Structures are given as structure tokens and as C-alpha cells.
């Protein structure tokens, strides 16, 4: 039985959306634009089209932003070659793509263990954290071996592609995305590289490539953090699948509207924010625990604890009684 994503991809292809003039080029430009937007770029798809196709510098946009997009385009063009050749994913190829991605925006680092440059795709020689107060990523001295093991495992899976369903192929690419950003091999550019690797695999196996829009950024980061804390890849797979379903529905609707047809496409249900879901559940049952809330919502207990702390600080929730045996009170605002 086909998954919802597989059915939607079938509908997308049935309509011939991917057979439109210059579709591949413009879709690639869209991928690049949204990947750099996640990192702070304000350049639009139309502006990238002008810059990429005509070599025109963009007024009002910083040189860093423009180089970020131009460099990522060069990296994607190289990844497309690897995809067409069914080349193995290797440490050297990942370093090559990282060097292209960071060519004009990377930095040099000087450490007690030696110098390295993110502009050259060098593996980091320093430890890094996920923001101030965040958890540290893997120790730098473990990265080379872990990255090699990651490539070997991924290549073993790639060789089984003929026995995998479309949904399984997508999940392999989503897992690769998550695992690479978790290893965090470079001092900078890990997010762009993880999304690029995901797309490389999708291009290789003839899938419609995934995009993560800037509007998805908050939930994207939350999904990465929750997956890392729970060690449950299912969380990130569900986020990526749901996000892709939303984008495909939107693309199909836009296409049908553009050719003057009604769009018989079921619109995605609006996602309920985690904090709103917590409030709703506590109204129904004030005796919910952190664990039962986590099970109901599908996030980690630590994630629930963070939301509860924020809601308490905002005066939305009160705790009545002890942690064990007490209950929650939702403060109704008149």
C-alpha cells in the first residue's frame, strides 16, 4: 500500500509538473535559495535567477549573501554529477562539496593542533556546541572515523536501492541529512551540506528533491533537536515527510491554478503549535505528567519540560501541589 507521500508524488508526476520548460533549473534555484535562507540569506528565487543566469550583481544584497548562493550553486552542480554517475559517498567527496559550498565565505582557524580552513573543506579541529548553553557536538578527534563509518553505512544502503520503496528511499535521504548534521564535520556549513547530501541522494534515485523553506526553520530546528535528544529518527522522518507533503500540495495547487483548473488537492491540515497542544491536553486532564504529554504530542519529555517552563513564566500555567500527585491549572485570560 502506497504512503501518502508516494501517492502525492504520483499525482505530481501524472500532471507533468516536472516536464515544464526549464523546470529542473528553476527547481534547483529554489532549493538553493531556501537552503541559504535557512542560514540568513535574504536573496529571493527571482533574484537568484537574475544573478545565476545573467551574472548580474544584486543591488542591496551583501557580497556574503551573493557568494553564499553562488557557491552553493557550484556545490549542487558538482553533486548532480556524482548523482548521475552513482558515485559513492566518500569523505573526500564530502570535503570537496564542502569546499565549494564555503569557497568564498569560509574562514581560517588557528588552533593548538594546527590550522584549518572551512573554505577548503577541512574537517574541524575544534569542538563546537549547538548555541550558547546547547549540547556539544561530537568531539573533533572522533569525527574522521565517524564520518568514514557514516559513508560506508550509507553506501551499503545505496546498493540496496532496487529493493527499496519510494518512501524508504526518501527516509534513507532524510536519515543521511540528520546523521551528517549530527556528526557536524565542519566548523561552518554543516546545515547546507546536510541538505545538499539529502538532495544528492534524491537526485540519484529519481526522487523529487526536498526543500526546507525559511518558514519551516523553527520546526526544522526543533525536529533536529528532538531527534537528537530522543535518538528517535522517526521524529525527523515524520517532520521531513510532512513538510514535503505540504510543499507538494502547494505546488500542485499552484500549477492547476496557473493552467486554469480547480485544484482537487486536499490541503494540509494546519499544524497545531506544541504549546497550544499542551494547553489543550491540560485543560482536558490537569493530572497529565511530562511523560504522558510527551507521548501524546510526539516529542521528548525534555521538550515538554521546556514548554511547561515557558508557559509557567508567562503565567499561562500554574502548578498546584507537588510534582508527584499535583495537577496543572490553565489560567484562562478574559
Where are these regions (language model features)?
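FIC/Doc superfamily catalytic core
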Residues: 1-188, 192-334
Amino acid at each position: 500500500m502506497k504512503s501518502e507521500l508516494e501517492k502525492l508524488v504520483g499525482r505530481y508526476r501524472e500532471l507533468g509538473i516536472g516536464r515544464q520548460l526549464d523546470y529542473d533549473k528553476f527547481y534547483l534555484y529554489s532549493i538553493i535559495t531556501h537552503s541559504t535562507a535557512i542560514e540568513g540569506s535574504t536573496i529571493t528565487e527571482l533574484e537568484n535567477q537574475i544573478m545565476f543566469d545573467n551574472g548580474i550583481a544584486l543591488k542591496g544584497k551583501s557580497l556574503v549573501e551573493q557568494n553564499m548562493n553562488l557557491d552553493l550553486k557550484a556545490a549542487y552542480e558538482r553533486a548532480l554529477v556524482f548523482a548521475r554517475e552513482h558515485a559513492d559517498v566518500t569523505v573526500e567527496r564530502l570535503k570537496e562539496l564542502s569546499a565549494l559550498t564555503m569557497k568564498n565565505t569560509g574562514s581560517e582557524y588557528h588552533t593548538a593542533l594546527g590550522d584549518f580552513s572551512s573554505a577548503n573543506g577541512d574537517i574541524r579541529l575544534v569542538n563546537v556546541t549547538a548555541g550558547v548553553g546547547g549540547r556539544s557536538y561530537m568531539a573533533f578527534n572522533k569525527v574522521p572515523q565517524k564520518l568514514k563509518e557514516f559513508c560506508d553505512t550509507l553506501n551499503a544502503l545505496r546498493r540496496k536501492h532496487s529493493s527499496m520503496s519510494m518512501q524508504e528511499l526518501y527516509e534513507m535521504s532524510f536519515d543521511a541529512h540528520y546523521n551528517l548534521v549530527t556528526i557536524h564535520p565542519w566548523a561552518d556549513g554543516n546545515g547546507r551540506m546536510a541538505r545538499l547530501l539529502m538532495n544528492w541522494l534524491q537526485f540519484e534515485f529519481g526522487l523529487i528533491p526536498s526543500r526546507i523553506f525559511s518558514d519551516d526553520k523553527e520546526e526544522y530546528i526543533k525536529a533536529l533537536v528532538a531527534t537528537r535528544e530522543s535518538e528517535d529518527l522517526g521524529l525527523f522522518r515524520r517532520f521531513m515527510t510532512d513538510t514535503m507533503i505540504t510543499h507538494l500540495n502547494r505546488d500542485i495547487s499552484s500549477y492547476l491554478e496557473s493552467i486554469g483548473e480547480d485544484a482537487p488537492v486536499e490541503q494540509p491540515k494546519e499544524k497545531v503549535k506544541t504549546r497550544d497542544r499542551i494547553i489543550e491536553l491540560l485543560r482536558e486532564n490537569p493530572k497529565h505528567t511530562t511523560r504522558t504529554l510527551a507521548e501524546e504530542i510526539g516529542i521528548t519529555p525534555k521538550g515538554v519540560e521546556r514548554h511547561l517552563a515557558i508557559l509557567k513564566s508567562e503565567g499561562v500555567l500554574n502548578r498546584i501541589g507537588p510534582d508527584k500527585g499535583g495537577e496543572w491549572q490553565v489560567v484562562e485570560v478574559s
